[in-house]
UniProtKB/Swiss-Prot annotation:
GO terms for biological process: DNA replication initiation; negative regulation of DNA-templated DNA replication initiation. InterPro entries: Chromosome_initiator_DnaA-like, DnaA_dom, Hda, Hda_Enterobact, Hda_lid, P-loop_NTPase. It comes from the Bacteria. Mediates the interaction of DNA replication initiator protein DnaA with DNA polymerase subunit beta sliding clamp (dnaN). Stimulates hydrolysis of ATP-DnaA to ADP-DnaA, rendering DnaA inactive for reinitiation, a process called regulatory inhibition of DnaA or RIDA. This is DnaA regulatory inactivator Hda. The active form seems to be an ADP-bound monomer. Forms the RIDA complex (regulatory inactivation of DnaA) of ATP-DnaA, ADP-Hda and the DNA-loaded beta sliding clamp (dnaN). It holds the Pfam family Hda_lid.
Amino acid sequence: MPLYLPDDETFASFWPGDNPSLLAALQNVLRQEHSGYIYIWSREGAGRSHLLHAACAELSQRGDAVGYVPLDKRTWFVPEVLEGMEQLALVCIDNIECVAGDEPWEMAIFNLYNRILESGKTRLLITGDRPPRQLNLGLPDLASRLDWGQIYKLQPLSDEDKLQALQLRARLRGFEMPEDVCRFLLKRLDREMRSLFMTLDQLDHASITAQRKLTIPFVKEILKL
């Protein structure tokens, strides 16, 4: 399965907020040469996909083979796509809640997990919108397997952390996002980070096109606020 991931979702562009332990655990698993498993759960939009993309990017840059399976897009492929993935250096399964109750997918994930345990060399990262025991899986053995490893809740960012995350993403894109503009966006817009980053992209494009710096009046004009 071809791997197409956002090139701006790396560990360098992820603002940690109250998640230093999770980031340390991820880095530790990625550094080690043997298998390791981490389950990350959070509400939608907290950044769990970003972390999987970042993990894939880091190992890909080392020349390692990785696999990323977004189960919210499972209609694009079949459960058999997991066959042979135990030979990769890293497997990331995103949004496992999307296949709760889907027997073929649950069995495919369970079998992959067991093959990874046997291989002893593949790192496995899985995300969901709730802890493993609350996923309402139809296969009890899979729920048990998912509960075995390190389990972390990805804590949402505070408003101050969101401000820092916006400014960090802007700097990585090569421009400055003034603090007053950030606070204006947080006050007037949906504060879910994915939405805020999309707005940031829109403002970056508008700023380049108009050859203007980002100010509150300019932002109001572009976003029609």
